[in-house]
């Protein structure tokens, strides 16, 4: 399971790259999508590699992401009881495990919003115009994507940047 995050905006982007990002539903900065790894996805990632960062997400980070940021129809979070009614999974951990094992696709989660919105990373990005290998932020980062996602899930802050009470 790959986590893909858009790190650069739309200004000055070539049309074919913009179309590819749109197909992946990465229309705004700090949006994340979960994708199953295959040859088509790898080709799309290579095309948009200067505008996104991606890597393999682990179970704990995926559970944290789903629990804190996954929205369902009407921009609602679900409790674990409501999650069981909607999806048949008893907990967010079971849902995360099924996604990682490939038992279900992210698009098969009933009424789930396909894009996960994140806050900007605490401490900021490195350099968005440089690749991750060169000390920047864009491109493939492997399992280090988990650290970035954890920096982008700020506890106590909702999706609109307001403090939760």
Swiss-Prot record:
Keywords: Ribonucleoprotein, Ribosomal protein. Pfam families: Ribosomal_L30. Gene3D superfamilies: 1.10.15.30, Ribosomal protein L30, ferredoxin-like fold domain (3.30.1390.20). GO terms for cellular component: cytosolic large ribosomal subunit. InterPro entries: Ribo_uL30_ferredoxin-like_sf, Ribosomal_uL30, Ribosomal_uL30_arc, Ribosomal_uL30_euk_arc, Ribosomal_uL30_ferredoxin-like. The keyword Ribosomal protein applies. Transmembrane segments: none annotated. GO terms for molecular function: RNA binding; structural constituent of ribosome. Part of the 50S ribosomal subunit. Belongs to the universal ribosomal protein uL30 family. This is Large ribosomal subunit protein uL30.
